[in-house]
């Protein structure tokens, strides 16, 4: 029994040699962040981001955490330790005690590789609010399309050649070749999957760029040059996840932007919500002929006057739409105001010929619409409806007071001015102009305004 207890206690102790190695790796990341973080990416400070180093089957070492250690962690020199037999963790950006942290799974990495991986995951934390690719599209990506595979393989070889090129003219020419091949392939691939690739390059690709840029600064491997073989053979191992390809094409485009435009492109990419492909097209003058022709047309046809007329027309349209809403809601009869708590309101049926935009997020259904939310709500309107997606409300004049009927749990209920019903169940409202069925709702009446708050 004593031996078992001692074995359990020993198992809970952090492995001293590995902890020492991880502390060295983290110290290098800290120094890199303090001296060169902006050289990797504007505002990036990996030294300010806590790191969870996961030792599978042993425990988790937390370094760079400020303040008291989170619950379950015991102090060790320079950090905190939590024993664990968990083996299923992945390197990622995550949260601990409500704070963003980088998580690094420790295996057989060299010290420089650990530094790079820490920078990669810290960059994910730094960019955690950026738009991500729709990972579900992996399930429908055309992995058996040989033409798409060949196109992607060609893109990899062009990017590798651009990395090897030693003068800017050759780099710019190869960038244009890459874009021509990429855009041709993307036209066949379709908009959703093309966007998936470009967003994956911004997500995983830029994190990998940060890793390789760190290697370039510290003169440690891996560096951009170490990835040339991977670009040359981008599609060689077709058994691997396609997402891994963007770990190669993303940093390759980013480094090519470094070579062609210095480091100023990074701030623009964020400020203007661009993709790597967008910026590469600009700095390589890929669309120069298009831009020249557009400027020629704008001059020949007085574009400034056209823009002024468009601005005036849009302003008049916006004012007219608002007057339409005022007219619709000012019609005689009971005004229904409906909201839905805790979930989104869907359109189960609409008449596209009679659907008008009033403003950003505000719609006017001029004739007919069915709005729904699963079992919680079903409606049909045969009268104009104003749907405000920003406020989550629906407004419609639903007929004369005398023609609107309310039943609650199968019982007819009168709609008197000033009345209020809370948590009413099996609600049904109807008139010749609409029907509304809600599983649960609060209902109130003030003057001509009937408010229905549909509850989850």
Feature annotation, model-predicted:
Residues 70, 75-98:
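Catalytic zinc-binding patch centered on the HExxH motif and its immediate surroundings
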Residues 103-118:
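Short pre-active-site segment immediately N-terminal to the catalytic Zn-binding motif
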